[in-house]
């Protein structure tokens, strides 16, 4: 299956668009509202993450998930994080166009062009604070040109969160499988996706789908103890009154 879409904007315009996207995402974990498809009835042009019954992931609009490393637990959209542990983020991508529309007879409308991905996560969470991990996919020739989703994390204790260097990797069934991704993933520019190379071209069909993974480490934050209350000063004892004079 395949889906294609064009969006000819410069990096500055992309940054402005992302600001609007991430601010509007508070109302919806995913967005924008868009037509949906099924595995039996995929799209007839390039479009990302809009199939609702994907056998691998379910509803593709829910495409950002997180799990604790080596926990044996599945990826989820909501997780409690603890200090001094590693977590792995998964961002799924799929051009939902039917493969038929990749050929020249159909003007290659199944191809998505200039496909980029970016992700953002909080640097610090206070105890009990809930934060979000954003995943965003943009293209230059699809409608919508940008799709996004969020996973949510809640801190059991106060923590900082840091990217584990060189953990970002693309996984798929094509030549780019296993390619490490730069930290541009965490900027408004993002990183290019691709199949035979990371050139931004993603044909339609599930055989060209994939995931981007990266890891986050949490570190406990030392909390200063409440200061000891200062003792109240001991009041001076009542002064001894002067003796009354003897009567003459």
Regions found by a protein language model. Name each.
Residues 1-3:
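N-terminal secretory signal peptides that target proteins for export/translocation
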Residues 223-248:
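Ser/Thr/Gly/Pro-rich low-complexity, disordered linker/stalk segments of secreted
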Residues 6-17:
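Sec-dependent N-terminal signal peptides
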Residues 18-21, 27-229:
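Exported/extracytosolic protein signature
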């Amino acid at each position: 299956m395949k889906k294609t879409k064009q969006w000819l904007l410069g990096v500055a315009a992309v940054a402005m668009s992302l600001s609007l996207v991430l601010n509007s995402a508070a109302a919806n974990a995913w967005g924008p509202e868009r037509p949906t498809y099924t595995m039996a009835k995929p799209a007839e042009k390039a479009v990302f993450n809009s199939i609702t019954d994907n056998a691998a992931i379910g509803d593709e609009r829910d495409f950002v998930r997180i799990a604790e490393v080596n926990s044996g637990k599945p990826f989820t959209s909501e997780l409690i994080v603890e200090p001094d542990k590693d977590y792995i983020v998964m961002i799924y991508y799929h051009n939902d166009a039917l493969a038929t529309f990749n050929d020249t007879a159909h003007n290659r409308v199944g191809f998505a062009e200039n496909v980029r991905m970016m992700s953002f996560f909080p640097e610090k969470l206070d105890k009990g604070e809930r934060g979000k991990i954003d995943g965003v996919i943009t293209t230059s020739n699809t409608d919508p040109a940008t799709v996004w989703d969020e996973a949510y994390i809640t801190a059991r204790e106060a923590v900082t969160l840091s990217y584990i260097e060189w953990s970002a990797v693309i996984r798929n069934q094509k030549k780019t499988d296993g390619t490490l991704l730069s930290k541009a993933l965490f900027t408004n520019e993002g990183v290019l996706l691709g199949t035979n190379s990371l050139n931004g071209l993603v044909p339609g069909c599930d055989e060209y789908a994939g995931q981007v993974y990266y890891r986050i480490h949490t570190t406990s934050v030392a909390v200063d103890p409440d200061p000891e209350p200062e003792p109240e000063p001991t009041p001076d004892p009542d002064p001894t009154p002067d003796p009354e004079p003897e009567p003459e």
